[in-house]
């Protein structure tokens, strides 16, 4: 199984805390955050990872050249200008070995059973499957609105009363993206 980790962001909200590092290399204990994400992927059976890197990409490449995760093939897709999620995927499509792959945000871990998610994906013959969460304070995040068949109807940035929730009442949806597709 292949995965693409989107690790090209500037991390402007973390700038003071990470002192010049890209946010995916933010130290958590003794290791960078991205190392925990790669370890989680390996535990899920994912051994082939493409890191889509942009901002401070040389720091990320240098770190993982020196500290290559065991049992994992790492490749890099370099963005010289920010391309966004779709642009990053378009940029690396020739690097993908197959049509089925995971995409993860490089700044969050969402504990999902990947095998169950893939089973759901195949059972529903979906083009894309998103892992969603329903945290207690969902209004603090961008929302995902679903239709009656649990298909994505809209993405809404942060809390807004512009679109109705799934139940038709005004306000933000209880669902947020887990950053795993």
Regions found by a protein language model. Give the residues of each.
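Glycine-rich "HGGG/HGxG" loop immediately N-terminal to the catalytic nucleophile
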Residues: 11-13, 124
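Conserved core of the sugar-phosphate nucleotidyltransferase
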Residues: 111-181
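Conserved N-terminal catalytic core of the sugar/cofactor nucleotidyltransferase
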Residues: 1-5, 13, 27, 31-105, ...
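Short, flexible helix/strand-to-coil boundary loops that buttress conserved ligand/catalytic motifs
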Residues: 18, 64, 156
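Short alpha-helical oligomerization interface
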Residues: 19-24
């Amino acid at each position: 199984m292949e995965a693409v980790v989107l690790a090209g962001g500037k991390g402007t909200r973390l700038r003071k805390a990470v002192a010049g590092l890209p946010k995916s290399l933010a130290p958590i204990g003794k290791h960078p955050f991205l190392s925990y994400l790669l370890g989680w992927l390996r535990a899920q059976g994912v051994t082939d990872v493409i890191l889509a890197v942009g901002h401070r990409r040389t720091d990320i490449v240098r770190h993982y050249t020196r500290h290559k995760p065991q049992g994992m093939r790492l490749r890099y897709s370099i963005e010289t200008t920010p391309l966004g999620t779709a642009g990053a995927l378009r940029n690396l499509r020739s690097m993908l070995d197959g049509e089925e792959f995971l995409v993860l945000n490089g700044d969050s871990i969402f504990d999902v059973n990947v095998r169950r998610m893939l089973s759901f994906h195949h059972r529903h013959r979906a083009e894309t499957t998103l892992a969603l969460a329903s945290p207690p304070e969902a209004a603090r995040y961008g929302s995902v609105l679903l239709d009656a068949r649990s298909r994505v109807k809209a993405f809404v940035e942060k809390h807004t009363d512009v679109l109705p929730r799934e139940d038709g009442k005004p306000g933000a949806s209880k669902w947020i993206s887990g950053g795993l597709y």
